[in-house]
Every structure is written in structure tokens, then in C-alpha cells.
Amino acid sequence: MRSILNMPVAALALALSPCTMAGDFDGSKQLICAPVEAAACASGEGCATGIPDDFGAPAFMRIDFLQKLVVGPKRASPIRSMDKTEHQLLLQGVELGHGWSMAIDAATGKMAVTMVDRHGAFVVFGACTPQ
């Protein structure tokens, strides 16, 4: 019973403590991200895999947390949602009729990105580094 009563106190202490996330991947520094692997999937058709260039993905993306943008060579996409946890940074937005999500590992900078619409999904894996 005593441990149950201490749970709210522990939760409050955790909520008020500073984030222990790696400083490079916590949203405090601009990042340059490079996609390395890609897959395009359509319902009932399976997935095609290849390098990101095969599917028209940019070679590099810059994440500007101050401006809340993911910037590529042709366009910039606003970051509509951002959530930090101990293990990852999650970003979300909408671009060209697709919903997108990006997850960046807080320790390594490895990333996974998805773009999805009613027809299928596009998945990219890669890595980010501080700019």
C-alpha cells in the first residue's frame, strides 16, 4: 500500500526533473538527415525496396527545430507535432497529401520515416547528425 501512495510523488519528481536525453537528438540542435534504405508499399501489391533516390527521396534533409520545418532541396514541410521521450524524438506533419512521421533515436540519431496516404506507404531508414 505504501508503494502505491509513493507512485504520484515519484511521477511528479520525474516530470519535474530535467530530460536525460542525448543533447544532439533532443530537438535543441538542427540536424542533417540522410536516407539510406527505402520501401514503397501499395495495398495488395506488396513492397518494392531500393535506395531512396529510386523513389525520388532527397539525398539529405535538414531539420530546423526553431522554424519547425523539415527542409529538402525542393520544398519545406512544417512540423505539426513533436514529442520527446527518453528514447526517441517523434515528428509529424502533412506534405503533398500524405501524412508523415519521423522517429529519431535519441542515442544514435538513426531515423525511420513514413509517408502514407489511402493508396499506400513509403518508408525510409537512415541517420541524422547535428548540423
For each feature predicted by the language model, list its residue ranges.
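Bacterial N-terminal signal peptides that target proteins for export
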Residues: 1-9
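N-terminal signal peptide c-region/cleavage motif recognized by signal peptidases
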Residues: 17-19
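Short, solvent-exposed loop/hinge segments that bridge or flank secondary-structure elements
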Residues: 27-67
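Edge beta-strand at a domain terminus
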Residues: 46, 51, 118-131
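Hydrophobic/aromatic beta-strand elements that line small-molecule binding cavities or substrate pockets
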Residues: 59-61, 99-106, 126-129
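Contiguous, well-ordered beta-strand patches that form the walls/edges
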Residues: 63-101
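Short, exposed beta-strand-loop hairpins at the edges of beta-sheets
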Residues: 103-104, 111-125
